[in-house]
Each structure stands twice: as C-alpha cells, then as structure tokens.
Amino acid sequence: MLREEIQRLKNREECVWKQRSPNAWLKEGDSNSWFFHCRANQRNHINFITGLEDNDGVWREDEGRMGGIIKNYFKEIYTASNSSGFEEILSGVHSAISEEDAGLLDRDFQASEVRLALDQMIPLTAPGPDGMSPIFYKSFWHIVGRDVTSMALNALNSGVVPESLNSTFIALIPKVKHPKKVADFHPIRLCNVVYKLISKVLVDRLKKFLASAIPETQSAFLSGRLISDNVLVAFETLHYLKRKTNGKVDQMALKLDMSKVYDRVEWEFLEQAIRHLGLGERMVSLIMSCISTVFYSVLLNGQPVGNIKPSRGLRQGDPLSPYLFLMCAMGLQSLLNKAEMEGHIRGVAICRNGPKVSLLFFADDNVLFCSAKEAECQKILDILAIYERGSGQKINQEKTNIFFSTNTPHKVQVRIQQVLGVPSIRQFEKFLGLSALVGRAKKQSFIFIKERVWKNLQGWKEKLLSQAGREVLIKSVIQAIPTYTMCCFKLLKGLVRELESMIRNFWWGYSGEHRKTHWVKWERLCEAKEVGGLGFKEIEKFIDALLAKQVWRMINNIDSLCHRVFKARFFPNCSISDAKESSSGSYTWKSIIGARDVIRKGMVWRIGTGEAVRIKEDRWLPGRANCSVISPLPPMAPDVKVSSLIDPNRVAWRTEVVQQLFLPHEADIILGSPLSTRRPDDRIIWAHTPSGTFTSCSAYKMLVSCDISTSASGSNPDSQKKFWKGIWQLRVPNKIRHFVWRMCNNALPTLVNLHRRNIVPSPTCGQCHNYPEDSPCGMVL
C-alpha cells in the first residue's frame, strides 16, 4: 500500500511538471521530472518580462507602468476603425449555401455534438481563465458532463454566449531574444474550455458546408483540401516564370503578407461576408455572439492585467477563427475576379491550354500572379486599398515580396518595386516556408532543414533525457521537422544520410565532437517494434510515401486546380499513371512522378463497368498479393478491357469466357467478385487500408514490409512478434524496457562487445576470470 501511494504521488508530481513545461511531443517516455523542472524553469526565465519601452522610448520596469503600456497597445489593436465599402468588396460574393443547407445549419444542437467536440480536443493544453484543461472534463465527464452540456447547448440554441464563458487570457511569448516593446511578443489567446466546446460544435457543423462555398483558390482548413495543393501550383508557376526567358509579356508573382490578420478583422465587414454566403439568421447571430462577447486580460508575469473589451478582431486559439477568416478573404477574391474579368489584371498560365492562375490563398498568406506592368500593379494597389478599408486588413510591406519572370527587363523590375514598395526574391530565400527556387544547387535549397534539426538536437535540455525520452523526441519532433518540405520535394540522398547520421548520433549519445558507440545498425532501429526495432522512420521511404499522396490526390481529384495545372503541362492526353517525366519539368514534378511507383505497388482497381481497366496490364484481381493476372492468357491486344468479360445485359461475368481464359484459382476469384447493377465507373482504391483510401502511413508500412519480405529469414515471424510485444508491454518504466531491448539485441557494452571493437584488451570476465563476459545477466548482477 505504501509503495502504491508513493508511486501515485510521484505520478501526480510528474503530471504537474509536464503541464508546466509544457511538451506536447513527450506523450510517453521515461519518468523524468528533472527534465520537466528544467523545461519549466527555462520557460519561466524566457517569458519573464523585466521591462518595456513606452511610446516615447522610455524604459519602464514598474509593473503598473508596464501593465498600462500593454493595455494601451492591445486597446489600439482591438478598436474598430471607420471601415467602409462593404458592398463594393462583397459584390462578387454570391450565396453559395442553399436555403435547404441553411436550414440544416440552423437546426437545434444536440448533446452528442458537445461530447464529440470534447473527444476531438487535445487533453493537455494551456488553460484559460477557468484554470482547466480539457483533460479535466474528459476525466470527470461522468460528474460534470450534464452541467457542461446544458451550459453549452443553452448558448448554442439561444444564440447568446455569456460573457462569463468568453473571457480570454493573452499570454506574451517573446519573438526575439531580447524583447523591448510589446510588439516583440507573440500574443497567445487562452480561452475557457467550455467556450472552446461551443466554438468547436459550431465549426463541426459549419465545415461540412463551407468546402462547397469557398473557392478552390483557398486550400487551407477545408475538408478534402490540403495546403500542399496550392503550394505545388505556386512552385510550378514560379518554375515557369524562372524558365520564361523570352516572350512579349513580362510576368510576376507577388506574395502578400498581411499584418496581424486575425486581430484586425472588422466585425461589421465579417457579418456582411457571412450573410453574403447565405447563412441563416440564427447561425449569423450565434457566430457574432461568439466573437463580440469576448473580453481580454493580458498575463504580465503570471498576473492578469486590464479588462479589454474589443470592437474588432478574431482570436487565434478559437476553433472558429480560421473559418471566419476564410469568409473574409473571399472579399479579396471577389475584387480580383472582377478586375480580371474586366481585363485590368491577367493571370499566369504555365502552358497554352492551362488554367490561368491569378490568386492563391495559403491560410493568411496570399500569392498574386499577373503581368509585370505598372498599370496592373497600380490596379492591385487600388484593390488592396479598398480591401484594407473594408476588412481592416493591412499589408506588411517588410514581408511582402515579388518574383519576376526571367524575361522581365531590369528597368521594369526596378520601377515595379518602386510602385509596390516591396523587394524581389533572391535564389534561396524562403517562400511559403520553403525555398523560393530549387535549381541545380538543390542541397543549398534545403540546407535550412539540416540547420533546424541540428538546432533542436543541440538543445541542452534534451541531454537530460534518457534513451526512452530521446526516442519520443526523435519520432515526434526531429523526424517531423522536414515533413512539410517532403510533401512537395524529394530530398537529396546526401542530405538524407546527413539527417539520419545526426539522429543516430543523438540517439546513442553525442558529447562535443566525440560520438558514442553505435551498438545497433540504423536499419535495425528503423524496423518496427514488433519485430525487434524501435520504429524510427527511414527518411527516404517516408519521403516516397508523402509524395505518393500527391499522386493519389491527382488520380482521385481530377477537378482540382492542382490536377488541372499539372495535367495541362505534363500529361494533357493521358492520366498521371501514364505520364512521362519531362526533362524541362520542375523539381516539384520530378519529385511527384518519382513516387508514382509507390501507388502502382499498392493500388487496385474496383470493377464497375470494366471499361477503364486492362486485363493484362492493370491490377484488378482482389484477394491476391499483387492483384495482377498471372494466367498464361492467349495473344491479345494489351488494351483489351475487363468489360469484355462482363455481360452488360445481365450485369454478370461471362462464366465460360472467364473459365476458358484464366487458371482455375483466378477464375474462381473473378467469378466470386460481385458486380453492381448500378454499373458505376471503375475506381482505383488503396489495397492497404480497410476503407480503400490512401494514407502516407500505410504506404510507408507497405514499403518497409516489401524490404522485410525480401530479406526475411526462416524464423517464425509470429513467435518473434509475440516475444517483442511482450517486452514493450512490460509494466516497468520505459527506460527499463529500453534496457531489456538492448540486452536482447546484444547492444550492451559487455567485455566481448568492447573487445570486438578494440576498446578493451581482453573479453574475459573480471569476476570468474574463466569465461568471456558476453552475458547481460553478468552485467546486471
């Protein structure tokens, strides 16, 4: 009993320090309270505000004066301006939500929606004024659930959110090493959990209808869209501009950066934008209540300061805010569409029959494409001025930049930069979080990934972690750093080897310039835990799996802007499955087409009419390892379709033909496959998920399993899995499980292993002096 009580108190203490650190990546690992102490202490030291400059440049260290400076700063930001011109901005935004859908949105909210919203919330997030994290409500839902649900439903169904639920803290996190002004801090909004529940329920209902209402030029936050779609289009267009060395029309790309996009949204403009989309009165009132009943207090060294009542702005941290911002951004889309229709602005098409692209949204970033003419640039400035007056948005000139096509004369470039007041992009500058251009010096283009990984690995705090903690850090943080880049670009093999070398050194321990002994091969560490590895990702295979997702999306989303742009340029007369790599293609395209074999290995056709599927060439036999036909078929044209095996009148297989052409076991598989009487189109599905939908995770597992199957030994894999699962399920601290894992992999510094590496002169046991010390048990004793 005493031991259980000590363990309970120890777990409670560790939980407290975990929440104070905080480290979202360390979901499991060793119990390492010293690590969390150091993280929390360092965090407090960094976030502590010793003084601030006021508007006159005078340094103030008195907390009362600092509180006044902070309060005045946020009051100015959250005070509405004299916005105008709503109708001009929103004239092109038409009702995209039908009356029937608006009625569905306005129906009463149910208790099940509240519970679903809670289940979707991350358990340990920073608490708001209520002092609670979602984990409290999840743990004690059987006690507080009824009251919380009643409170949330009352607000949702009445359309009035009480101010007591909508109070919000603003925490200030330094953006620079030595902050002096309030602007040098990043404000983090901390909402009450009950308000987040209300907001999340509202979002879950809204987002089902917004995908059809928001234009395809916006690829963030919406179901069925990925931000990488627009990233691919943008970089393909930039590649076209770079290669455009002649032609009468000079062209350019303008990346717009909006300053404090959420904070400056005018509520009156937002309300008009929502109404133009066709939302019902009840939904409009509820949304406006969510954003207008808020009031802020700023945390100054842990103490709330001020009581700020805003008259404009959205909160980062509110689940509703990203979707409301998308609705506002439709105003800019409307103005640009009108200018394009009137011929004032001309978009960029990367080939003769390709779609013209004039605007792409990336959440709160935008990229405009137009001709490099002073008149068009002046029109863009006029549009932005109108949009700023109505929406409250403001262009950040310092972070806005231009990229010109190669054929644009230098004089024209200089003049346009003067008109717009922004610089042009150089070779390796960042663009949308990635290198603006990927040319011959590819390694230099992606060097920032190596620098970020190195910076994370060199953090002194991570040296406090055991190998169990370092495992989780590698998986959750280090190997996740390049994911955004790897979704669009294939990293060079040399860079991949360098990244893996850095990760290996960190895993085994690295002090200064001397690395510790690597007792197990990297390939072994990358194997799944159930077969004796640690489940680290092989970066090259993971890149292929991520890029394969782009191929899959192009196969299944043929109406998307991304597919239409790439099809027009690279495979106008066929599908991406039959496309050829172009020598003049961008590095983006070469990266994507290089991952096509991953899809070919894992895809299978689901037969509808059979008119799109070739008997000999395609994978269409269910229940087989490779889904391909192996029967020795008689000579036939390679493009003979599966439809020739189907009787269209009966919607059934031609039994005699099938039995005559195929081996008995394949004929049985074909005849046992049902055909739909609705005769749907043939469809490609992914064979490695139950739903038939592609996931990068399943593709990676498929690639790894292919290697394992080709190198598998004669040992019993089931018994191996049982053995290793037993180790990882031991009810002991994670560092002990890792020690057992090292014993089983002969990865401990026994004298035999040290002698094999010429570290000690003799492998003989120092206790008995008779036998080699190769038994881990001897070390334990």
Give the residues covered by each predicted segment.
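A helix-boundary/hinge signal
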Residues: 5-8, 15-27, 31-781
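Short, charged, amphipathic alpha-helical segments
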Residues: 1-3
